[in-house]
Structure formats: C-alpha cells, structure tokens
A protein has these predicted regions:
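Surface-exposed short loop/turn segments
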Residues: 62-107, 114-129
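A structural "domain/chain start" motif
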Residues: 7-47, 152-154
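Soluble non-cytosolic domains of exported or imported proteins
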Residues: 29-36, 81, 85, 125-138
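C-terminal/domain-edge helix-coil "capping" segments
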Residues: 122-154
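Short acidic low-complexity segments
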Residues: 47-59
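Sec-dependent bacterial lipoprotein signal peptides
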Residues: 1-7
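Sec/Tat-exported extracytoplasmic proteins
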Residues: 42, 46, 67, 94, ...
Length: 154
C-alpha cells in the first residue's frame, strides 16, 4: 500500500545524474585510489569522456590536496587512548584551460570516531582501514553529486 502511494504521487529514487561535461580530465597522482574510483564512477555513467590529456577535455578536475588525519579523542583514567578521531580531507576544483571555474576550490572533510583497545591492536588497525575506505567511498559519492550540480555557461 505504501509503495502504491509513493508511486502514485510521483516519488522515485534519485538515480545517477549525468555530468554537465562532455569530457573531463582527472588530474590526480599516479596510483591515487580516489582518482581511480572517480574514473570508475564517471565511466559507469557513460555520458562523459575521460581524455588522456587536459588539452582534449572540456573541463579539468584538479586535486588541491588529500590527507588522512588521526587524533586522540579521549583517554582512560590511566592515561591510555580510548578513542581516536579519523579525518579524511579532500580539496579540488574544476576549471578549463582558459581559467574559467566550473567548481571553485572546495574542501570536503569527513570524520569518523573509532574506539581503541590495547588488547585488540590488530583488529583496530583493520577497522581503521575499513573506516578510511568507507570515507573514501563517501567522498567519491559527494564529489560526483557536486560535479553533477556544476554549472557550465556558454
């Protein structure tokens, strides 16, 4: 019944939106996991080409910075670490060779908290890796949504 009501009112899940660029050069370092994930997502859309050089592209995606940070969030009464805060920062811009900005310099910061135990060091290191991978996937999805919302004039 609920599904029928949702369909009747015109509700539909948000699908992947095509990017406004006919071609986009992704300027990331060699071996960048985030760059590879962005390329995979853009190829999956099928509407935007990924040329080998910036001269062939309508727009250029430039990474300004990418960093993983880890800081102590809380200590036990004995002075041992109980929680860490993980941060994943990513800054980028989208422009063309003439200097026009399609997406101005933008920084996205994702934060996750992780508990810590001296007795489970290996398990917590593995969990930390999973959290960073999860943050990277979230980052790719946020960047894709922001790219889809970019405005191109003329």
């Amino acid at each position: 019944l609920l599904a029928l009501l949702l369909v009747a009112c015109g509700f539909q899940l948000r699908g992947s939106q095509p990017l406004p660029f006919s071609s986009l050069y992704i300027a990331t370092g060699e071996g960048s996991e985030l760059g590879a994930a962005l390329r995979r997502n853009i190829r999956a859309l099928g509407s935007t080409q990924l040329p080998a050089t910036p001269q062939e592209a309508q727009a250029i995606f430039t990474v300004i910075g990418e960093a993983r940070e880890k800081s102590i969030l809380s200590l036990s009464g004995a002075g041992r670490v109980r929680e860490f805060q993980l941060r994943y920062r990513f800054a980028y811009r989208v422009h063309d060779l003439k200097g026009r900005e399609f997406v101005p310099p933008t920084e996205i910061v994702l934060v996750r908290d992780i508990s810590f135990s001296d007795e489970q060091v290996l398990a917590k290191e593995y969990e930390e890796g999973l959290l960073y991978r999860d943050m990277q996937n979230d980052m790719v999805q946020q960047v894709m949504r922001r790219l889809a919302a970019a405005k191109i004039e003329g």
